[in-house]
Amino acid sequence: MSFEVLEKLEAKIQTAVDTIALLQMEVDELKEDKAKLETEANELRAQREQLEQKAQQTQQEHAQWQERIRALLGKMEDVE
């Protein structure tokens, strides 16, 4: 092989190495982004579960208050 061909081959190899390095950095960034998104998704799931539990608790309390009010109204009707 001539010296020119070797220089061209070296340039192509260097370009490939540079491209691989850039792609690896991009992959690393994407992995970090993915990890952050997974953490955020898990936090949001936990918050949603807490809100669902709170909503259920509030509904139960509401039902209990309605029952108490009905009982009081029934007693008031009995008094009249």
From Swiss-Prot:
Biological function: Non-essential, abundant cell division factor that is required for proper Z-ring formation. It is recruited early to the divisome by direct interaction with FtsZ, stimulating Z-ring assembly and thereby promoting cell division earlier in the cell cycle. Its recruitment to the Z-ring requires functional FtsA or ZipA.
Gene Ontology biological-process entries: division septum assembly; FtsZ-dependent cytokinesis
GO CC aspect terms: cytoplasm
Superkingdom as given in the UniProt entry: Bacteria
Family matches, as InterPro entries: Cell_div_ZapB (IPR009252)
Signal peptide: none
Location(s), subcellular: Cytoplasm
Name of the protein this chain belongs to: Cell division protein ZapB
Sequence similarity: Belongs to the ZapB family.
HAMAP family: ZapB
Gene source species: Vibrio vulnificus (strain YJ016)
Quaternary structure, from the entry: Homodimer. The ends of the coiled-coil dimer bind to each other, forming polymers. Interacts with FtsZ.
Coiled coil: 3-80
Listed Pfam families: ZapB (PF06005)
Keyword set, alphabetical order: Cell cycle, Cell division, Coiled coil, Cytoplasm, Septation
Record flagged with keyword Magnesium: no
